[in-house]
């Protein structure tokens, strides 16, 4: 399967650099998976598309201010993007510098260079950094870090991004990118969903910087996914099984919720889904058999990305690419701060030919 089959033309003007004034004020493109029919509307229309007893599964990860600027004590400037917090004083990070730091290199981090760290070891593309500070890592990041806006948002981060690039229900610090489908849900919207009898459950997947890495191979099957830590606790498993038993739908809010639930289903030995705690490298592309998800709320994704492949596996390749062409023609806003889609599962998608 060719990566190029998932390309589409996107004018630069359709990339959203700021969110809407109101979280739930974005547009919503609804795609009926079985028929391919498209409906244009606004995000609050989602209320009318869900039935009492349906289950929304959110990702409650919280974005950390993971981007740090500084220099080596010896002089060279560098940029650090924390990928994973290992403990109170150690992180794994990407480091951009004219010359990669060697183990033992001392760093001065923060706009005022007030925080000392040491490069302890290298693990392939990642660097293990040890912070020489009495504060824990999360406190340091909150004090001196910048919000890690995606590379396609071509502007410096602003103070407002600490709130805007964060879901209102985020609880578990650890992500370096927001689960962006969740950005559209505000408190009034959540209250209205509860009022209608919509059930809610929360997984955790700490989104890594790898989510923005381009696919660097020509053939999809040759791509190796990055690892991300996910948790699907017992209460989520119980909610999913109860939802299925009563004939309702499991609706994932975002591709990270999809990957969490489907990882738990893949790893399950004795039931459709069991609790899951660990790293996942699940790669969902056309031909994949969905085990849990019945519908999906998601944003518009980058051309040739693993996420548009995931959507194509869910809705069907032709349906997905046609919907994206229509979204461009209708000038929907794309990517993290952009508009949303509501998609129902196409059971024929896994048999469909791509290209």
Curated annotation (Swiss-Prot):
Gene3D superfamilies: QueA-like
Compartmental location: Cytoplasm
Domain of life: Bacteria
Catalytically driven reaction(s): 7-aminomethyl-7-carbaguanosine(34) in tRNA + S-adenosyl-L-methionine = epoxyqueuosine(34) in tRNA + adenine + L-methionine + 2 H(+)
GO molecular function annotations of the record: S-adenosylmethionine:tRNA ribosyltransferase-isomerase activity
InterPro entries named among the record's database cross-references: QueA, QueA_dom1, QueA_dom2, QueA_sf
Gene Ontology annotations of biological process type: queuosine biosynthetic process; tRNA wobble guanine modification
Pfam families: Queuosine_synth (PF02547)
The protein's Enzyme Commission number: 2.4.99.17
Pathway field: tRNA modification; tRNA-queuosine biosynthesis
Keywords: Cytoplasm, Queuosine biosynthesis, S-adenosyl-L-methionine, Transferase
GO cellular component, one term: cytoplasm
Subunit structure, interactors included: Monomer.
Task performed by this protein: Transfers and isomerizes the ribose moiety from AdoMet to the 7-aminomethyl group of 7-deazaguanine (preQ1-tRNA) to give epoxyqueuosine (oQ-tRNA).
Family affiliation: Belongs to the QueA family.
Name assigned to this protein: S-adenosylmethionine:tRNA ribosyltransferase-isomerase
Lineage of the species this protein comes from: Bacteria, Pseudomonadati, Pseudomonadota, Gammaproteobacteria, Enterobacterales
Name of encoding gene: queA
